[in-house]
Amino acid sequence: MSLLKMEYNLYAELKKMTCGQPISLFNEDGDFVEVEPGSSFKFLIPKGFYSSPSVKTSLVFETLTTTDNKITSINPINAPKLYPLQRKVVSEVVSNMRKMIELKRPLYITLHLACGFGKTITTCYLMATHGRKTIICVPNKMLIHQWKTLVEAVGLEHKISIDGVSSLLKELKTQSPDVLIVVSRHLTNDAFCKYINKHYDLFILDESHTYNLMNNTAVTRFLAYYPPMMCYFLTATPRPANRIYCNSIINIAKLSDLKKTIYVVDSFFDPYSTDNIRHMIKRLDGPSNKYHIYTEKLLSVDEPRNQLILDTLVEEFKSGTINRILVITKLREHMVMFYKRLLDLFGPEVVFIGDAQNRRTPDMVKSIKELNRFIFVSTLFYSGTGLDIPSLDSLFICSAVINNMQIEQLLGRVCRETELLDRTVYVFPSTSIKEIKYMIGNFVQRIISLSVDKLGFKQESYRKHQESDPTSTCTTSSREERVLNRIFNSQNR
């Protein structure tokens, strides 16, 4: 650990790295506080900050030659086969680590790789290459299975722990597996942190963007007080401030043959209202809507909009245009509503729910991977990041208030490389609740802009798509009726 005075140059470097955001670190008293320039306190500067050679320091860090925590079960024959771009990442990592060892720098690297790149298999290859006992830390148990499958394929001795850390510590007294896969809440236990700091050399933080290391979290405390010898952050959407804890980044662009389309499903609704809606509208401008909780609650009870989403999904699914669908909502009650309605239409053999409150959901996710046709309804919290269903070909985004990082992660669920190349996203900028009309339009436009400008989607109007599709159930007369309704509504505003 390095306790340093917050001199101007150090503060400026940290500020630059976080894009001007406030910086919070542990001070010499162990308090997690916002750093102010010229502070009289000394601060605990994270080890990973010095992994970049651009950071000048006289500090010397230990290298792997001082430890003996080696994997005993490696079989080179079992090393996973990588694509050329994945091999390029491995080559970059090995080259960077040689330089780090030569310069006595911490072996900390962020793998900033696109959704669908294959971060998990690439990291498993690196793990086997290093031959060091490894901790794989995931934000939730849904991600456990994909790691388990690949670690087993590599043939490494491993153990999974998702529940009580106390019982795990008892087991570790008699056995110390080469690879330990845990959920991040285990890091709240100091005894466990001390154990892995002593007995494991490599720490892999999967989906590192899900942790805000400017908050006093278990992961923040672990990296500050029990820094591992080697560390990988894995993410497609890195948080700028997290660079303070892992300051060397490898990012390799991935060209894709996928045909990605985002359909804007617009419509013109008559104003819709209920007592419940009128009650929630009163809260839109209050402090209780600071994070747009009531905005999303209003969307969840916007019956005309919900019906439009269902009609669009049913039409596309029945036509065979899309086959493996992910439906995403912000709120659980919104998810349950869509699930029940779709279940009535298509039955339990086709419609599934990704409910965080159901312990069997991870097993259900595994079971649907091999299905040719299914509809999976879930929440942004549960399935917006890390959902491992590579065969997904379409996404219905039913919510609107989503930040850029969540948007990119969510769209990444349908950007996995498979033999089928068509990927389709549907967004719904219209609402029948006039008080949130412009707000919803602006939020959905942000989704559209990011998908087109950054992720290579092509924007198309769903109405034009229907008109050009001879199999569409939307008749010319119904389209004309909508146009007339639009004109009538505009004249009577």
UniProtKB/Swiss-Prot annotation:
It comes from the Viruses. PANTHER family: ATP-DEPENDENT HELICASE IRC3-RELATED, TYPE I RESTRICTION ENZYME ECOKI R PROTEIN. This is Transcript termination protein A18. Interacts with G2. Might be part of a transcription complex composed at least of G2, A18, and H5. Its main location: virion. ATP binds at L113, A114, C115, G116, F117, G118, K119, T120. Residues 100-256 form the Helicase ATP-binding domain. It is an enzyme of class 3 (hydrolase). The lineage of its organism: Viruses, Varidnaviria, Bamfordvirae, Nucleocytoviricota, Pokkesviricetes. It comes from Ectromelia virus (strain Moscow) (ECTV).
